[in-house]
């Protein structure tokens, strides 16, 4: 496995792979890798000859400096996991390598609408940071496919739209959420939970599933469903942050024409803001 930290060396390797006619898959990450990331890697390996994993804690997508400062940097452990998975290339640049003149004056990519609604409304600038770094990685790695987790549902929708709008010739593969046995979605943020909070955390998925059951049973008073779910989260020890039921294909309000809904839940548990989602077919 090759570990690359600079843009010139990355470009050199990508040119070589292209000359050899290799099909390249990209898995963009911020490191602190867990089994959910390994599922993305496995999916990438199934679709391509060569897998490139990027590890970069992107300052542009953090709306709170304290979150950026405390985000775990575990490059050595991450590379050991990726080596066992037989990843071909790890791109782990410094912030200076990606943003040589800082982030304030750096050219950015914005996806209107999707970047400021829902999760974007509570995290100003977050999705602009995501779309900027992902577009830069697409330009550098020139992958044939790129794999993203469905846990970050809005992010996946945003990337798909950016790819369509910008004309990137890249197949975007969404990989289903990987869960612990008790239902908790795997996430780097779970590492912020205390042992006691970890016992409470599966309650998020239980509330999510309860909403899904109501929708599948034909209930359509969404305001009431959301209000009850928020109360249930608070009773379980969470601080409910945002609960949305949206059209899964547009992320707009559910309408009579909606065929699928996505339930999007965000809640604080101690210092960890946990997110999860679930798709529901509407009869």
From Swiss-Prot:
Sequence positions that bind ATP: 30-37, 149-152, 186-189
Under Pfam families, the record lists: Pantoate_ligase
Record bears the keyword Plastid? no
* Compartments reported by the entry: Cytoplasm
Q: What class of enzyme is it?
A: ligase
InterPro entries for the chain: Cyt_trans-like (IPR004821), Pantoate_ligase (IPR003721), Pantoate_ligase_C (IPR042176), Rossmann-like_a/b/a_fold (IPR014729)
Return the Gene3D superfamilies for the record.
HUPs, Pantoate-beta-alanine ligase, C-terminal domain
Residues where beta-alanine binds: 61
Q: Any other noteworthy remark?
A: The reaction proceeds by a bi uni uni bi ping pong mechanism.
**What is the name of this protein?**
Pantothenate synthetase
Native source organism of the sequence? Escherichia coli O45:K1 (strain S88 / ExPEC)
| Native organism taxonomy | Bacteria, Pseudomonadati, Pseudomonadota, Gammaproteobacteria, Enterobacterales
